[in-house]
């Protein structure tokens, strides 16, 4: 008997992502005191929060939502001229500076670490500039040492957390024969050994079942990281800095996460200028703001994407977790949409832009109906059909 043909739409199976499965995810700005965290936050959000030259001046995490710059959204708004325009946003938390020994409560360590546990990703800000007027908690500027300090503190806190979980599970096993406890214990022991070997959880080759358990722990070293390298304006302009090669080498050796050089001084100066003046200044100095890239990279790092709904009343970005299926995406609009999901009518932004309008997309056969198993892609334009008891279709 010949083998059964594979289903045509069976694509590669993606393994689950580390982290919470939610559309309400946030990223935290983390680093040592006086590296430029609050300056970055102030510039991103244009909020007036303290950024004085004093360790621990940020005690409670400040929160803000920053719009995601997107030419696709701008084009849709220009095309549909809607009454309402709602872009995607990145929720950013400014978290006070960590110091060596934070996992043992040094400085304000326990508070800060709990704030980091509450976010879904990390903007790790590194100071790569020297300035006698801005103190460094370790006196000498050394970004690689700072990298090791922060990553070690997060890892040590994870080791402490996992150790306590192992104790709890072992106690539970004395009272229960639940097989799941044994599975959890074996994973915890494996994770503890991994951490004690100096490796972050996010770089482990975990099985699907492992990831489902790990996601209940919210481990600090499991969170995605984007390294933001704070330079002085001169180094940023000439794209050279004596610390950058060493930072790059360290990052490549430790997982190869994204690095983005920026200049807090330059960004703050731009933010204080009128738009025309800022554009002229950038053109004259052959510079551009790093903020759009920082925002987009942070949004992607925490595994968020968005789809569009578009019409004359409203153009809106709907944020969902990467790997979300059509019914889950529908639920981002309203729970009834998910509960009574019938299908998703989908067109790609690129097709709409190329062909000019919805009827042309349909005529070209590029307007598709997708069912419950469809995995929504970033930039999809979707119209959902649903039916619930006592309701109608949309």
Swiss-Prot record:
Binding locations of Mg(2+): 38, 58
Regulation of its activity: Activated by GAP1.
Domain of life: Eukaryota
Annotated ATP binding sites: 34-39, 56-60, 94-97, 230-231, 263-265
GO molecular function, a single term: ATP hydrolysis activity
TGS domain location: 303-386
Record-given protein name: Obg-like ATPase 1
Species assigned in the record: Arabidopsis thaliana
């Amino acid at each position: 008997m010949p083998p059964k043909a594979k289903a045509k739409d069976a694509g590669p199976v993606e393994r689950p992502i580390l982290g919470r499965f939610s559309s309400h995810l946030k990223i935290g700005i983390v680093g040592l005191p006086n590296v430029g965290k609050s300056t970055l936050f102030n510039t991103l959000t244009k909020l007036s929060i303290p950024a004085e030259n004093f360790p621990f001046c940020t005690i409670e995490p400040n929160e803000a939502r920053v719009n995601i710059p997107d030419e696709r959204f701008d084009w849709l708004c220009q095309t549909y001229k809607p009454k309402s325009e709602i872009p995607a946003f990145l929720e950013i938390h400014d978290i006070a500076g960590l110091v060596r020994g934070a996992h043992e409560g040094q400085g304000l360590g326990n508070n800060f670490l709990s704030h980091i546990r509450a976010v879904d990703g990390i903007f790790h800000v590194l100071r790569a500039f020297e300035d006698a007027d801005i103190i460094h908690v370790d006196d000498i500027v050394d970004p690689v040492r700072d990298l090791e300090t922060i990553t070690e503190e997060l890892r040590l806190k994870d080791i402490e957390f996992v150790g306590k979980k192992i104790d709890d599970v072992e106690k539970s096993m004395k009272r229960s024969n639940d097989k799941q406890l044994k599975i959890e214990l074996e994973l915890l022991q494996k994770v503890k050994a991994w951490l004690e070997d100096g490796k972050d959880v996010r770089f482990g080759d975990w099985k699907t079942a492992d990831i489902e358990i790990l996601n209940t722990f919210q481990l600090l070293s499991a969170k995605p990281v984007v390294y933001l390298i704070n330079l002085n304006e001169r180094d940023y302009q000439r794209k050279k800095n004596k610390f950058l090669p060493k930072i790059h080498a360290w990052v490549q050796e430790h997982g190869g996460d994204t690095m983005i050089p920026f200049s807090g001084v330059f960004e703050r100066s731009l933010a204080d200028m009128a738009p025309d003046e800022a554009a002229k200044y950038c053109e004259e100095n052959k510079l551009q703001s790093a903020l759009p890239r920082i925002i987009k990279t942070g949004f992607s790092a925490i595994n968020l994407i968005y789809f569009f709904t578009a019409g004359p009343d409203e153009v809106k970005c709907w944020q969902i977790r990467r790997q979300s299926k059509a019914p889950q995406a529908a639920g981002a609009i309203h729970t009834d949409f998910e509960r009574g999901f019938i299908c998703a009518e989908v067109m790609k932004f690129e097709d709409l832009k190329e062909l000019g309008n919805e009827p042309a997309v349909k005529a070209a056969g590029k307007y598709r109906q997708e069912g419950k198993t469809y995995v929504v892609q970033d930039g999809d334009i979707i119209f959902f059909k649903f039916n619930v008891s006592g309701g109608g279709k949309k």
